[in-house]
Amino acid sequence: MCYGGTAMMAFADIKEALTPKPSAQLYDVPLLYCMLMLMGVGFVMVTSASMPTADRLFGNIYHFTIRHGIFLALSFCLFWITTSVPMSWWKKANPYLLLVGLGLLLIVLIVGREVNGSTRWIPIGPFNIQASELAKLFFFSYISGYLVRKRSEVQENIKGFIKPILVFAAYAGLILMQPDLGTVVVMFVTTVGLLFLAGAKLWQFFVLILTGVALVIGLIVLEPYRMARVIGFLEPWDDPFGKGYQLVQSLMAYSQGDWFGQGLGNSVQKLQYLPEAHTDFIFAVIAEELGFVGVSSILIVLGTLVFRALLIGQNALKNGKEYEGYLALAIGIWFAFQTMVNVGASAGILPTKGLTLPFISYGGSSLLMMTIAAGILLRVDFETKMATKQATSGGAKR
């Protein structure tokens, strides 16, 4: 019995040693903890914020909770898979992923499901996939690869600077046809940030920003519903039951939060007063129920996650992993800007854009793609640390 038990233990040790899996110590543990905390908070707050709407629409207060739970389970599976995929695969596949993204954006215009006047979702059984969320990550992957292949051209030749802008314009045109200006703005800011970090000339950088701002203003002025949003943002109290209704209700939620909030589940504004309480305006419900302390804590966690993403990108670039570094930086900029827009819109600092709060808002496609992005960050960090470790051990042997 003793020999048998010893043999089994030895076999288990050998099997574990031979299994090719990354060491937990080589992962960015703070980033992983931040993601898990945000997902946990998101599940609780989606449950709290969605109950009145779920009861009214479906007669089941846990309708959105169940769906969010399913997407969380899928997210964990995709996260685990992503951390196991070598970054070399993403690097080789990024041109094809760009084409897949374009295909999805075309498909959604043909067979997409319309919700609140926007055709952004491809119906797949009981679920809807938001094409622009997938296209966003695929585009960032392509731009990162382009900057590696054409970095000197981007720095020295105007053609190298314009080429990625043309690709962005093709994506932006299809996304605006849905319409979805918020996603286009996120992609634009991230693209500008990457081009700047890649060493584009300063005058090109400023021209691009001014052009982008002018185009956004033009798109707002030409679309009455966007103009109405801006007017509602600038003067919400002039029309508190019309153009300014959503922002007024959101600000009322903030005002009732105080230091420690009304308590979990005790929000008044989510009771059919605040539209999109569990999606775009979930941060207002968090402010009302958890107060200043809760809001500040979540922002600290989100800020830490963004900081870790940017640090991972910086370390990758220092170690000669340019594609991995640019992609990690793109993800960090994406998370940071989307957080700023979501929080700013709910607090009346920015016009509403219909963007989710990373890892917290209800929205399956957003959650899935952001979790995949977090998995990429951990994989980049793992490969960078492994390369450094191997270089160190190789130098020590010599």
Swiss-Prot record:
Family: Belongs to the SEDS family. FtsW subfamily.
Gene Ontology CC: one annotated term: cell division site
Catalytic activity: [GlcNAc-(1->4)-Mur2Ac(oyl-L-Ala-gamma-D-Glu-L-Lys-D-Ala-D-Ala)](n)-di-trans,octa-cis-undecaprenyl diphosphate + beta-D-GlcNAc-(1->4)-Mur2Ac(oyl-L-Ala-gamma-D-Glu-L-Lys-D-Ala-D-Ala)-di-trans,octa-cis-undecaprenyl diphosphate = [GlcNAc-(1->4)-Mur2Ac(oyl-L-Ala-gamma-D-Glu-L-Lys-D-Ala-D-Ala)](n+1)-di-trans,octa-cis-undecaprenyl diphosphate + di-trans,octa-cis-undecaprenyl diphosphate + H(+)
Source organism (scientific name): Pseudoalteromonas translucida (strain TAC 125)
Keyword tags: Cell cycle, Cell division, Cell inner membrane, Cell membrane, Cell shape, Cell wall biogenesis/degradation, Glycosyltransferase, Membrane, Peptidoglycan synthesis, Transferase, Transmembrane, Transmembrane helix
Cited function: Peptidoglycan polymerase that is essential for cell division.
InterPro entries: Cell_cycle_FtsW-rel_CS, FtsW, FtsW/RodA
Pathway, per record: Cell wall biogenesis; peptidoglycan biosynthesis
One GO process term, biological-process aspect: FtsZ-dependent cytokinesis
Annotated protein name in UniProt: Probable peptidoglycan glycosyltransferase FtsW
Gene: ftsW
Membrane topology according to the record: Multi-pass membrane protein
Record bears the keyword Cytoplasm: no
Compartments reported by the entry: Cell inner membrane
GO molecular function: lipid-linked peptidoglycan transporter activity; peptidoglycan glycosyltransferase activity
Pfam families linked: FTSW_RODA_SPOVE
